[in-house]
C-alpha cells in the first residue's frame, strides 16, 4: 500500500508494556505515513502522552524534547528495589512511620533546582554503552549528579504506604529517582509503582487517543485526530508576513524587523512562529539584533 505524505501531530496515549518506538511503528502503519518520529521516549512501564510527529512536524520534534514534562506517579514507601520501580528485585524493606503531613513536607523540599544521580537502569551511556547493560551484568559505575528543575510537585493521594503525586519537571528528570529520593528523605525508602505522563510542553493528555481506538477507526477518523504542525509551537509568539516578505522568508532570507507590519512580541533572541497572510505556517524564526532570521522552514505549508 502506498505511503502517504502526512503533516501533523498525533497525541497518543501509550499503554503500559509497549516501547515508544513500537508505538510509533504501529501508528505509522495505521496512517500509512511516509515519515514519522516521536518526541522523546516514554519507558515501556510508563503510560500516557506520547506526541508523534508526521511529515513536516518532525522538524520541530526537538522543541518537545527540550520541553517540561508533567507526570502522575505512585510510589510505595518502605521498599527499595534494584531498578527503582516494581520490575526490580527488592533490596530492603523498612517500616513506614511517617504520616501525610510528613509526606507533604518532604515533597515541598524537592521543588526547585535539585541534583539527581541518574539511575543505573537508564539509557544514559558510559563509554558508548548504556548504563542498564552494566546494571544487568551486576556492575555499578560512577555517575555524576545532574541539576534538574522541579517546577511543581503536589500530593494527589496518600494511602500509606502508597503515595500518588503530580510533578512538572525539566528535561532529563528521572521520576523514579525522585521517588527514591523522597523515600530516603522520609527515612523509609521507596520505589515507583505507576508512572503516567499527562503533559509535554503545551500538549496534554486530554485529547490523546489510544492505539486500540485508532485501530478501530476509519482512515478519515484517524486523519481527523491529527493536530496541525503548529500545535507544537503554540507557546511561540506569532508573526505574519505579507506575500512579498513571505516569499523572501521561504527563500531563507533574513528580514529586517522594521519591514514587518507588526514587530514580534518576543524577547531579544526569542523564537517566533511565522505565517503568511492566509495563516499558513511558514516556519520558525529567531528575532535578534533587528532581524528575523529563518530557523526551520515548512516546505508544504502544513
Swiss-Prot record:
GO function term, MF aspect, one: tRNA pseudouridine(55) synthase activity
Q: Which reaction does it catalyse?
A: uridine(55) in tRNA = pseudouridine(55) in tRNA
Single GO biological process annotation from the record: tRNA pseudouridine synthesis
Its Enzyme Commission number? Answer: 5.4.99.25
Which cysteines share a disulfide bond? Answer: none
Positions of the catalytic residues = 43
Q: Which UniProt keywords apply?
A: Isomerase, tRNA processing
Family the entry assigns: Belongs to the pseudouridine synthase TruB family. Type 1 subfamily.
Family annotation (HAMAP family): TruB_bact
Q: What is this protein called?
A: tRNA pseudouridine synthase B
List the source organism: Burkholderia mallei (strain NCTC 10247)
Gene that this sequence comes from: truB
Amino acid at each position: 500500500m502506498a505511503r502517504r505524505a502526512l503533516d501533523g501531530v498525533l497525541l497518543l496515549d501509550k499503554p503500559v508494556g509497549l516501547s515508544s518506538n513500537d508505538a510509533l511503528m504501529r501508528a505509522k502503519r495505521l496512517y500509512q505515513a511516509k515519515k514519522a518520529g516521536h518526541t522523546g521516549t516514554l519507558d515501556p512501564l510508563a503510560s500516557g502522552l506520547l506526541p508523534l510527529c508526521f511529515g513536516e512536524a518532525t522538524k520541530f520534534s526537538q522543541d518537545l524534547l527540550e520541553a517540561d514534562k508533567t507526570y502522575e506517579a505512585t510510589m510505595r514507601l518502605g521498599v527499595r528495589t534494584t531498578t527503582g520501580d516494581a520490575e526490580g528485585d527488592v533490596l530492603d524493606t523498612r517500616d513506614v512511620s511517617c504520616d501525610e503531613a510528613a509526606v507533604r513536607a518532604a515533597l515541598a523540599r524537592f521543588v526547585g533546582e535539585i541534583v539527581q544521580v541518574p539511575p543505573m537502569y537508564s539509557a544514559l551511556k558510559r563509554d558508548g554503552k548504556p548504563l542498564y547493560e552494566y546494571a544487568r551484568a551486576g556492575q555499578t559505575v560512577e555517575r555524576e549528579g545532574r541539576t534538574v528543575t522541579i517546577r511543581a510537585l503536589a500530593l494527589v493521594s496518600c494511602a500509606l504506604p502508597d503515595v500518588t503525586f503530580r510533578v512538572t519537571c525539566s528535561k532529563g528528570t528521572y521520576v523514579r529517582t525522585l521517588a527514591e529520593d523522597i523515600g530516603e528523605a522520609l527515612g523509609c525508602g521507596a520505589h515507583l509503582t505507576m508512572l503516567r505522563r499527562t503533559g509535554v510542553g503545551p500538549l496534554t493528555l486530554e485529547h490523546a487517543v489510544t492505539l486500540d481506538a485508532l485501530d478501530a477507526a476509519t482512515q478519515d477518523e484517524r486523519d481527523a485526530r491529527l493536530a496541525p504542525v503548529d500545535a507544537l509551537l503554540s507557546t511561540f509568539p506569532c508573526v505574519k508576513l505579507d506575500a512579498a516578505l513571505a516569499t523572501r522568508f521561504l527563500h531563507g532570507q533574513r528580514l529586517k524587523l522594521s519591514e514587518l507590519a507588526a514587530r514580534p512580541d518576543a524577547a531579544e533572541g526569542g523564537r517566533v512562529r511565522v505565517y503568511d497572510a492566509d495563516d499558513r505556517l511558514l516556519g520558525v524564526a529567531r528575532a535578534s539584533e533587528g532581524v528575523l532570521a529563518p530557523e526551520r522552514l515548512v516546505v508544504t505549508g502544513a
